[in-house]
């Protein structure tokens, strides 16, 4: 059972950065939302971006919407854990709130691409757990992009072209999940998160926890 301090059963634990990446349309955003809704204490990393706000998006909840000069200033001040250019726009993860969450034993979920994942690893490799989501087929990926009706045909063609490059980096990830059924894929991702949370090296309070029990047994 998880307690309010970010540990399990009273054992202090360091948080982790849980990364989901995929080609556009493979399901990482849907899986991210499902995971945040169900996993206790997991928070979604909020990125800064220069792209225009889409209908229904809220500044500070979905993204921090900033202009290019502001974004460049944040890069110059080393305020990002990772940042990248994606489809003529910029995205970056503010450093301070993530570092505070990990220190408090809370996990942070990242919906980022392979470039961002590599930057996270270069800065904090022991804290990063990465999962790459694949579609079951190219045809299914294209169908999903058309069905969500967010982009023009020209943009969709660009995303399909980009997908091949993104998939080529699958071997840089810790885990691979093929999303041919969203429910099954979600259970797989959730199981990965749970197992990583319980790794001995992340339970930084386990030595004291065991020592205390041994002391009681020796009385």
Swiss-Prot record:
GO molecular function: ATP binding; guanylate kinase activity
CDD domains: GMPK (cd00071)
Top-level taxon of origin: Bacteria
Pfam families: Guanylate_kin (PF00625)
EC number: 2.7.4.8
Keyword Kinase included in the entry's annotation: yes
Gene that produces this protein: gmk
Keywords: ATP-binding, Cytoplasm, Kinase, Nucleotide-binding, Transferase
Naturally occurring in which organism (per UniProt): Rhodopseudomonas palustris (strain BisB5)
Protein name per the record: Guanylate kinase
Cellular localisation: Cytoplasm
Keyword Secreted: no
Enzyme class, spelled out: transferase
Bridged cysteine pairs (disulfide): none
Function: Essential for recycling GMP and indirectly, cGMP.
């Amino acid at each position: 059972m998880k307690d309010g301090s970010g540990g399990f059963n009273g054992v202090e634990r360091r948080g982790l950065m849980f990364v989901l990446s995929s080609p556009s349309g493979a399901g990482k955003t849907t899986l991210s939302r499902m995971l945040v809704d169900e996993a206790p204490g997991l928070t979604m990393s909020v990125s800064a971006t220069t792209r225009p706000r889409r209908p229904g998006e809220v500044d500070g909840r979905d993204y921090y919407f900033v202009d290019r000069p502001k974004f460049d200033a944040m890069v110059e001040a080393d305020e990002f854990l990772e940042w990248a250019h994606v489809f003529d726009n910029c995205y970056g993860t503010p450093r301070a709130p993530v570092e505070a969450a990990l220190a408090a034993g809370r996990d942070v979920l990242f919906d980022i691409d392979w470039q961002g994942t590599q930057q996270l690893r270069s800065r904090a490799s022991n804290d990063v757990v990465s999962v790459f989501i694949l579609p079951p087929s190219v045809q299914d990926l294209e169908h999903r992009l058309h069905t969500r009706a967010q982009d023009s045909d020209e943009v969709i063609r660009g995303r399909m072209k980009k997908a091949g490059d993104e998939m080529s980096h699958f071997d840089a990830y810790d885990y691979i999940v093929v999303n041919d059924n969203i429910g099954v894929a979600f259970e797989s991702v959730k199981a990965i998160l749970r197992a990583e949370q319980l790794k001995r090296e992340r339970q930084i309070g386990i030595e004291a926890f065991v020592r205390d029990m041994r002391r009681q047994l020796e009385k």
